[in-house]
């Protein structure tokens, strides 16, 4: 659900940063995918990416350009995109993928490991080719890689340093970079100028901490925030109330 605001003049638009402000009900104290909750999902999607995405019912390439299964269905090989770096300058390659998934599997300290737990081993074939081996064939192995809660890539340098659960350890390959946190108030992300893909529209994304649902809705109605995202943050009744107003538009995912 989004709030519309008055359009700036062309001269104003050239001078002002394009900023999107949204709100969540829980503080973003960690964005490490294997330990995050659903309300942290928006920050994870800004900063991290996986090998594949799920869009409109199809599995599509992201950091992997293509993939294939072995004849017996127990090995899944990904051919990786070249020339990608993490936010800290660490190269994205097959060794980085192997490091990431071996760090996560199996680790009882992480809450979101169901998809990772199925892995048997990971093989680096060459610099940009990696194979995941499984104990048996299973129809949903590729689908497992679509889940942002388990299958996005973190810089191996962050894993080695051990600060992957702090906000300073939010280092992925995504279109936005973590910039700052003000405890109890907001987290700010800025556009990744070295992003491998198309540059995002907004220069900055600010995620405010507003724990009360009524206060979040009032913030949307007043223009303090531009967006409320997800059923965990907005009831159906509140959605209907908000979208009945002339300055607020909404969309429902099927």
Where are the language model's segments positioned?
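Surface-exposed binding/hinge segments that line
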Residues: 68, 114-157
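Gly/Pro-rich hinge or "lid" segments in bacterial periplasmic/extracellular proteins
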Residues: 147-200, 204
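N-terminal lobe/hinge region of extracytoplasmic solute-binding protein
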Residues: 23-71, 102, 171
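Short, well-ordered beta-strand elements
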Residues: 16-27, 65, 75-78, 97-100, ...
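Short, low-complexity disordered leader/linker segments with a strong preference
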Residues: 1-20, 58, 66, 103, ...
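Short, solvent-exposed loop/turn elements at domain surfaces
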Residues: 28-35, 58-60, 140-143, 185-188, ...
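Extracellular/periplasmic solute-recognition and catalytic clefts
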Residues: 104, 121-122, 179-190, 206-254
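Aromatic- and charge-enriched surface segment that lines or borders ligand/interaction sites
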Residues: 65-109, 125, 131, 216-219
């Amino acid at each position: 659900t989004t709030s519309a605001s008055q359009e700036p003049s062309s001269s104003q638009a050239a001078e002002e940063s394009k900023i999107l402000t949204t709100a969540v009900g829980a503080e973003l104290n960690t964005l490490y995918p294997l330990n995050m909750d659903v309300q942290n999902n928006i920050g994870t999607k800004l900063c991290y990416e996986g090998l594949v995405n799920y869009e409109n019912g199809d599995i599509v390439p992201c950091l992997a350009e293509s993939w294939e299964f072995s004849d017996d269905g127990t090995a899944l090989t990904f051919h990786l995109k070249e020339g990608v770096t993490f936010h800290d300058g660490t190269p994205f390659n097959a060794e980085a993928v192997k490091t990431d998934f071996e760090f996560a599997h199996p680790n009882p300290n992480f809450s979101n490991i169901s998809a990772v737990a199925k892995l048997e081993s990971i093989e680096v074939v060459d610099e940009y080719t990696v194979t995941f081996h499984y104990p048996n064939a299973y129809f949903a192995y590729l689908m497992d890689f679509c889940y942002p809660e388990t299958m996005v890539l973190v810089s191996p340098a962050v894993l080695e340093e051990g600060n992957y659960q702090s906000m300073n350890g939010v280092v992925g390959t995504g279109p936005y970079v973590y910039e700052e946190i003000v405890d109890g108030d907001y987290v700010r992300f800025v556009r990744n100028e070295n992003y491998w893909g198309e540059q995002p529209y907004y220069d900055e994304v600010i995620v405010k901490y507003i724990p009360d649902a009524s206060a979040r809705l009032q913030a949307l109605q007043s223009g303090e925030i531009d967006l409320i995202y997800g059923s965990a943050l907005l009831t159906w009744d509140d959605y209907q109330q908000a979208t009945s107003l002339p300055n607020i538009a909404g969309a429902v995912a099927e």
